[in-house]
Amino acid sequence: MFDILMYLFENYVQNDLEVDMLVDEDQLKKELALAGFRQTEIIKALNWLEHLADLRDSEQPYLCHHEQHSFRVYTPEEMERLDVECRGFLMFLEQIKVLNVEAREMVIDRVMDLDESSLTLDDLKWVIMMVLFNAPGQEMAYNQMENMMFDEQPGRLHS
């Protein structure tokens, strides 16, 4: 499923095409099948994207009410999916104001909905990009994250 999300993100978002301008879901499914993806994985990926859009538009309490200086305690399931490096990176992004609390929670929600048992740091970065791209008012954060990803120098974790 993650491969499909990456394919869509790279072919539509990175090429500045509006995902909403896709002709229809059936045509997209056909395109993805022609690209070699399995139908079950295609459906999972499209559902994942739909849930991301729902999060953006929802009034979920965990997305609306938070203490300004609260500390995130991860559940055992979240810690299994997000290793120490990934959790540290999320904290780093919050500290430099790339992620706010709401965006962080959206990222964690989307990570937990992936059918991957664990994620690499690079996978997490792509999920963050997808969330920031889809979240209203996060254009500057998206640009910062994009710059961090594509301007990284080998051997340097942070600039």
UniProtKB/Swiss-Prot annotation:
<dbReference type="Pfam" id="PF04361">
    <property type="entry name" value="DUF494"/>
</dbReference>
<dbReference type="InterPro" id="IPR007456">
    <property type="entry name" value="Smg"/>
</dbReference>
<comment type="similarity">
    <text>Belongs to the Smg family.</text>
</comment>
<protein>
    <recommendedName>
        <fullName>Protein Smg homolog</fullName>
    </recommendedName>
</protein>
